[in-house]
Amino acid sequence: MSTLVMGVVNVTPDSFSDGGMWFTTGAAVAHGLDLLEQGADILDVGGESTRPGADRPIKEEELHRVIPVIRELSRAGARVSVDTMRASVAAQAVEAGASIVNDVSGGLADPDMAGVVADAAVPFVVMHWRGHSDLMQDHASYGNVVVEVCQALSERASDLCARGVNQEQLILDPGFGFAKLPEHNWSLLAHLDALQALGFPVLVGTSRKSFLGTVGLSPGQRPRPPAQRDVGTAATTVIAALAGVWGVRVHDVASSVDALRVVAAVEAAG
C-alpha cells in the first residue's frame, strides 16, 4: 500500500505555520484545490489552531470557518477530513461531505465524539494527547516515550471500540509535537515500527514542527521558521513511507509527493 498524502487546510488566524493565509472560505478552497493539483490524496480542514499555547475558538466560530470549506471541496470531488475535537463539529462536517474525522484528542476532549464517529461509520484518526494546547507542554515527561505512547494509543483504541467504534475505523497518530520534547519526537520517528505493530493504520504529522527547525543548529541559535522546514518534513515523509505508514499530514504537498515518488522508484528497482 502506498503512503497517502494528507494536505493541511488551516482556516485559522493563528496556526503556527500559516495562520491567516487561508482564513476566508474562498482562499481556503483555492488552497485546497491547489494542494489537490500538487498530488494530495486527502485534504484536512481545520478551524482551530492546536499550536502550543493556542486559545480555542467557540463552537459557532469553528463551524463558521470549516463547514463552507468542507462543503465546497467535497463538491469539487476532494476526499476531505475534518480536523476537530468537537463532536458537534464532526457531525456537521460529515453531513457537509467530510469522510474522515481527525481528532487530536482522540475523542478525549468531547465525550460525545465516539458516538458521532460510530454512527457516521467514517475513519477516525486518534492522536496521542495529554491535554489542550495551552497546557500540553507541561506534560512532556516520559520514562520511555515509545512504550508509553504505544500503550496509551492501544488503550484509547480499546476504549473507543468498547463505546461502539469499529476497529476498522481507527487510524493512530503518535502526536509529534504534542506534549513532546524534541528528543521524544526523534525517538518516535525512529521507532515507527512499534506503532505499526499495534495493528492499526498510522498517520505521521511532523510537518513544519519545531523539532525539525533545530537540526544542525548550534546551541543558542534560533530555530528555522516553519516555512523553512519543508525539506526536513520531506525527509520524515521518506522515513514514514519506508516504515509502511498509512499516511503523512503535510503543509507542502509537492515536496512530500516527490519524496514518495523517490521511495517508490527505489522500491521498484529493488
Where are these regions (language model features)?
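Catalytic domains of carbohydrate-active enzymes, especially glycoside hydrolases
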Residues: 30-46, 242-243
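Active-site-adjacent loop and "lid" segments of alpha/beta metabolic enzymes
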Residues: 17-31, 50-72, 79, 85-88, ...
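Extreme N-terminal starter segment of soluble prokaryotic enzymes
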Residues: 1-5
